[in-house]
Regions:
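Membrane-interface segments of envelope glycosyltransferases acting on lipid-linked substrates or membrane lipids
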Residues: 1-365
Length: 365
């Protein structure tokens, strides 16, 4: 089986991690993998390092006929069986490529939780008959896909996943690097510095936490983006420079997590199923997360891995963090539940099996 993974921006976010995981697992085992992209970044570098057959071409918009022709030529010359597209632009271009080469099947993974406009919904209904299967990475995403014009019978919910750590945490160097004492309560979030990640809301919540917490604490924000200066000024204006540290982009995410006590996700929108939360759980970190997208699939009463709060409720966010900082028994139980949940629900090997079952289904096997 020959599978081509199609993505516009080959960057360093969760979707790119999703694609890399699949390629690393399937290539030269169950399948021969190929990769096509438009804008270069970390993922395109990683594919080159792994010697994956790679193609770069411009994808201006979802209706880019020139891109569709290039894609069809790649599929014809390499006898591609399946295009696995990420995001709507890539999905539409994949469908248009079938005008020029009809043999390729199309699988589309939706990584977004956005309600489409009426125009998009109409177009979706025209396009989806030519999409063989749709994967949603969370349950709320599936409901939105149906609302956006995708047929329910074509949609499979397959969560993102990680390789279970079994509760083993590496010795972290982050506290020593930043001069953080062992008795300091370390709260961490790893996110692009983008409005959708709700970091202004998180900073405002920490301002309230600062008034009630009884122990030393620090919030570490790992990530880069266009809001860096704005967030830095906000932190300084609130007098929280000693309590909130902007770390910039880091390649040692697991090292940071292993030196932390809890994780927070403050997203306001666009969150499907967060890899960062899964990685935090894998490092035994109970998590406080906003009730958006697929966060509730991970953090809920059944999993017992932390607390869900409504976006914008700074009191709820501050109080949830405070409770975890003060209740050691609750914190320890949450750590145990994190490992159990990763093993049973978000185990990457299960995700590999379920995704390949989709490929076999579209190939009639």
């Amino acid at each position: 089986m020959k599978i081509l993974y199609l993505i516009n921006h080959a960057g360093k976010a969760g979707t790119e991690k999703y694609v890399l995981n699949l390629v690393e697992r399937y290539n030269e085992r169950e399948a021969k993998c190929y990769f096509a992209y438009n804008e270069p970044g970390l993922l395109s570098e990683q594919m080159a390092e792994r010697k994956i057959s790679t193609f770069q071409f411009e994808m201006k918009n979802p209706y880019d006929i020139k891109a569709a022709k290039v894609l069809s030529r790649i599929c014809r010359e390499n006898k591609i069986d399946i295009i696995h597209a990420q995001y709507p632009r890539e999905c539409y271009i994949a469908v248009l490529s079938k005008l020029f080469y009809k043999k390729t099947k199309i699988v589309f993974t939706s990584h977004l939780t956005l309600s489409n406009s009426i125009a998009w919904k109409i177009t979706n209904r025209l396009i989806t008959p030519f999409v063989d299967r749709v994967i949603s990475v969370c349950n709320s995403g599936k409901e939105l896909l149906i609302n956006n014009g995708y047929p329910k019978k074509k949609i499979d919910v397959i969560y993102n996943g990680v390789i279970p750590s079994g509760g083993k945490r590496e010795k972290s160097t982050i506290r020593e690097e930043l001069g953080i004492s062992e008795d300091t309560f370390v709260i961490t979030t790893l996110a692009r510095l983008h409005y959708s990640k709700g970091l202004e809301f998180l900073i405002d919540s920490i301002e309230k936490l600062d008034r009630i917490i009884k122990r030393n604490y620090v919030l570490l924000i790992g990530g880069d983006g266009e809001l860096y200066d704005e967030l830095k000024n906000r932190i300084e204006d609130k007098g929280l420079s000693e309590k909130i540290k902007l770390l910039g982009f880091r390649k040692d995410a697991y090292n940071i997590l292993c030196g932390s006590d809890i994780y927070v996700n403050s997203s306001m929108c666009l969150e499907a199923l967060s890899f960062a939360i899964l990685e935090a759980l894998n490092a035994s970190l109970p998590t406080v997360a906003t009730n958006v997208g697929g966060n509730g699939d991970i953090i809920n009463e059944n999993t017992g891995c932390g607390k869900i709060v409504e976006y914008g409720d700074t009191d709820a966010m501050a109080n949830a963090i405070y409770e975890l900082s003060e209740n050691s028994e609750y914190l320890e139980k949450g750590r145990e539940n994190c490992i159990k949940t990763i093993n049973e629900v978000f185990n990457l090997e299960k995700i590999f099996e379920d995704t390949f079952d989709v490929y076999k289904k579209v190939m009639g096997k």
